[in-house]
Amino acid sequence: MRLFTTIAGLNCYLNLLRNEQKKSPDTIGLVPTMGALHKGHLSLIKRAREENTITVVSIFINPLQFAPREDFKEYPRQLEIDKEFCEKEGVDVIFAPTPETMGMKNALSTDAQDSTTTVVSPSHMTSIMCGVSRPNFFQGVATIVTKLLNIVKPNNAYFGQKDAQQLAIIKQLVKDLSLPVNIVYCPIIREASGLAISSRNQYLTPEQKEQASMLYASLCYGRKIFLENQDTPNILETVENAVKEKLASQPVLKLEYLEIVDPETLKPLENIQNIGLLAIAAYIGSCRLIDNILLRNRKPIIAIDGPAGAGKSTVTKLVGQSLGLLYLDTGAMYRAVTWMVLQSGVPVTDQAQVAELVSQCQISFNSPENNHVVINGQDVTVAIRSREVTNNVSIVAAQPTVRYFMVKQQQQFGAKGGIVAEGRDIGSHVFPNAELKIFLTASLKERSRRRLVELKQKGQTNISLEEVEKEIICRDQKDTNRKISPLRKSSDAVEISTDGLSIGEVTQKIVDIFKTTCYGKSSVNNII
C-alpha cells in the first residue's frame, strides 16, 4: 500500500499504473473519507475492491464543511490507525493531502471558502434538511469532491446512503458537470441496535448510543405506518407525526428536522408516486446525528442473480407468473446487443465501435408473457440463444459503455417496480434496493448437464458434456473477473442451491421467501 500527501506524487503513481499493460485505466475506485474509519467505511472499501483493480482511499478533513462553531479542531484525527485499517483491508493507495495541497491558504480562517474556487450546487438541494443549520456545508462538500474526482480520475466513486442529501448533490454535480465517473451508493451500516455507524458515534457514551438507536426505530415505525396506510389521505403528514411521537419517547433526543423528499432531487413531497426519502437529524447532548430510510409506493422488485446454468431464466419467469410481476430478462438484453454487434461485422473487442452501436439501439419486450425480445424493431428471441452469441456475450457485456446504456434501460423498466429480473449483478448493481435478492447456484456438473440438454433441444447435437463444461468454466471466469460490475453475491441476498431441486421446487422456495419478507407481507396481497 502506498501513501501520498501530494497531488504530484499521487498522479505520478496512478499514471504509472495506467500505463502498465496489466492495469486498465477504467479500474480505479475512489472512497472519499474524512478519516476516523469504521465499519461503514469498510463496506465502501470492500465494494470498491470487488469492483476495481486499484482502490484509492482519500483521507481529508475538509475545513470547508465546518461552520465557525463546529468541531473542526476536535474532529478525530488518527492517520496511523487509518493506515493500518486500510492496509489490512487491501487498499492500494491512500491520498492524505493537507488543506494547502487542496488549495486552501488557511484552513482555520473564517474566510477559507473565499480562498479557493468553489462549486455551488442548486440552491433547492442545499437550502433544506442539513443545509438549514449548515449553510456552507454542501458547497464545501461539492468543492472538495470535485477536486478529488479531478485529481484521482476514478472510474467509480463510493458513498454511503447515510449521507443521502450529500449523495444526491454529488450525483447531480457529476451529471451537470459531465464528469466521467460512476457514483456508487452503498447501504447504511448499523450497530446491532440499529444506530447508523458514524465517526461521531465515538462522542457518545454507551447509554447515549442506546438512546440514539431510537432514531432508526422511529424511522422504521414511520415506514410501517406508510406501508399499512399508503392510500390514506395526507399519509405523509401522518407518517411525520408518527415518527415525532415515537421519537418523543426518548426525550434526550432533540429533533432538528424531519423531512420527506425525493431521494434524487431532494424536493419535498406531498405524496409518493414511486419512492421517497424519510430523513431525520437530531441532537443527543452536543452530538448531531442523521439517519434516513426509503419509503416505496410501488410494486416490489425481485432480483435473481447467479452463474450461467444455475436455472435463473426459467425460474425467474415462473416467479414472475406466480406473483404477477413482469419478467425483465436482462441477460436477453445483453445477448441482443451482442447479436447486433456480431451482425454488424464490428469486432466485439472494438469498444469504440460497439459504443457507437449500443448508444443508439432500442430494446423492447413485445408480448412480455412470451418473452419476445426486439432490438431496433427486429425480433431476435431465437437468434440470441446461439452458441456464437453465448461465447461472446461476456466480452460485450463487460464493456463500460454497454453496461452504462443497458443498466440505464433496465432501471427505466424498473422505475415503477412490479418486475422480477435475473442476471449476474442485478441485486448488487442494477437494483440495489430490490425488496428481495436471490442468488441461485448449482454445481458445475449440474449446470453443464442442463446446458447440454438445452443445446440438444435446439438441435445443436455436435457438442459433448466436456466441451460444455469448458465453456461454462470460461464463462464463469469472465463473469467473475470482469472489471465492470462482476458476478457477485449481494451481502443481503438469499442463496439457493438448485442441485437436486426441480424447477417447481426452486420457484416455490422463492415465492415462499418473498411472502415472508417484510415488504412481501405488505405488497403481496396487492399482487396475488
UniProtKB/Swiss-Prot annotation:
Main location (coarse class): cytoplasm
GO biological process, one term: pantothenate biosynthetic process
UniProt entry tagged with the keyword Membrane: no
Pathway info: Cofactor biosynthesis; (R)-pantothenate biosynthesis; (R)-pantothenate from (R)-pantoate and beta-alanine: step 1/1
Name of protein: Bifunctional pantoate ligase/cytidylate kinase
NCBIfam families attached to this UniProt entry: cmk (TIGR00017), cyt_tran_rel (TIGR00125), panC (TIGR00018), PRK13477.1 (NF010004)
Segments of this protein annotated with the region Pantoate--beta-alanine ligase: 1-293
Signal peptide coordinates: none
Catalyzed reactions: (R)-pantoate + beta-alanine + ATP = (R)-pantothenate + AMP + diphosphate + H(+); CMP + ATP = CDP + ADP; dCMP + ATP = dCDP + ADP
Family annotation (InterPro entries): Cyt_trans-like (IPR004821), Cytidylate_kin (IPR003136), Cytidylate_kinase_dom (IPR011994), P-loop_NTPase (IPR027417), Pantoate_ligase (IPR003721), Pantoate_ligase/cytidylate_kin (IPR024894), Pantoate_ligase_C (IPR042176), Rossmann-like_a/b/a_fold (IPR014729)
Organism: Trichodesmium erythraeum (strain IMS101)
PANTHER family attached to this UniProt entry: CYTIDYLATE KINASE (PTHR21299:SF2), CYTIDYLATE KINASE/PANTOATE-BETA-ALANINE LIGASE (PTHR21299)
Role played: Catalyzes the condensation of pantoate with beta-alanine in an ATP-dependent reaction via a pantoyl-adenylate intermediate.
Subcellular location: Cytoplasm
Keywords annotated in UniProt: ATP-binding, Cytoplasm, Kinase, Ligase, Multifunctional enzyme, Nucleotide-binding, Pantothenate biosynthesis, Transferase
Binding, beta-alanine: Q65
Positions with a binding annotation for (R)-pantoate: Q65, Q166
Active site: H41 (proton donor)
